[in-house]
From Swiss-Prot:
This is Ribosome-recycling factor, chloroplastic. The gene is RRF. It comes from Spinacia oleracea. It is found in: Plastid, Chloroplast stroma. Pfam families: RRF. Its main location: plastid.
Length: 271
């Protein structure tokens, strides 16, 4: 090994400390005199691994001897920059995906709240007890809109008609189903002022739940960054910078939630 490697080895050995151990460098003559009565270990490094092994090795033709009170060996691994960057990237990607999924959920929940115009998405949240198992209505029936104020439900299995009817009655849709034994028709009455206000409260609650979900995602990401800091993979300044970027992302998605909410509120209040 080159002289620079010996210097590096010496530096690592001087900085290495272990419980019940006393580490020091000895020259060749010390090794020759004390080899019979001294536990010895050597240092070697490969990539980002540091290992202390029992025995004697030579660097540039000269042995490096390490005294220890106990004959112990262990491997210590330090994360590479590439690995740290990969962990950061994974946290960022996961955070953005979860926030995007939250937006999709909010849209779906808003679509299930009826407005003046009939839409199959109004039935997205309705679950039917089908052979003892709750399933989504759209998975067991075809839903269409014959006109702007009605919905037509055609079940794939006619025996599920009663279960579908019951699910609609117990939902918060606010309509009465008409079951003719073949299909179910839903006629949507015009929204009254009071009903609009009630639905506006429902939408407001759904929006707030979405905002809470986004904040919780931010909290989880921040905890992940702090964990990397405790593991000495990130510095305090790194975490501050990442937290600032995370807050910008959070603000962006909070604005998306607010925008979707305002749009739905306008639809509800439109006569």
């Amino acid at each position: 090994m080159a002289a620079s490697s010996l210097s590096s080895a010496t530096s690592y050995l001087h900085s290495f400390r272990r419980r019940n151990s006393c580490v020091s460098l000895q020259g060749v003559s010390d090794m020759e005199c004390n080899i019979a009565r001294t536990n010895v270990s050597v240092w070697r490094s490969s990539a980002n691994y540091v290992r202390m092994d029992c025995g004697v090795k030579k660097f540039s033709g000269k042995a490096v001897v390490v005294k220890q009170l106990q004959n112990r060996a262990g491997t210590f691994r330090c994360a590479t920059m590439e690995e740290v960057e990969a962990e950061k990237s994974l946290i960022e990607t996961n955070t953005k995906q979860r926030m995007e999924k939250t937006i999709e959920t909010i849209r779906s929940n808003f679509n299930s709240v009826r407005t003046n115009r009939a839409s199959p998405t109004m039935l997205d949240r309705i679950e039917v007890e089908y052979y003892g198992t709750p399933v989504s209505l759209k998975s067991i029936a075809q839903i269409s809109t014959p006109d702007a104020s009605s919905l037509l439900i055609s079940p794939y299995d006619k025996s599920s008609l009663k279960a579908i009817e019951k699910a609609i009655v117990t939902s918060q849709l606010g309509v009465s189903p008409n079951n003719d034994g073949e299909v179910i028709r839903l006629s949507l009455p015009p929204l009254t002022s009071d009903r609009r206000k009630e639905l506006a409260k429902v939408v407001s609650k759904l929006a707030e739940e979405g905002k809470v979900a986004v904040r919780n995602i931010r909290r989880d990401a921040l905890k992940s960054y702090e964990k990397l800091e405790k593991e000495k993979k990130l510095s305090e300044d790194n975490v501050k910078d990442l937290s600032a970027d995370l807050q910008k992302l959070t603000d962006e998605y909070m604005k998306k939630v607010e925008s979707i909410y305002k749009q739905k509120e306008q639809e509800l209040m439109k006569v």
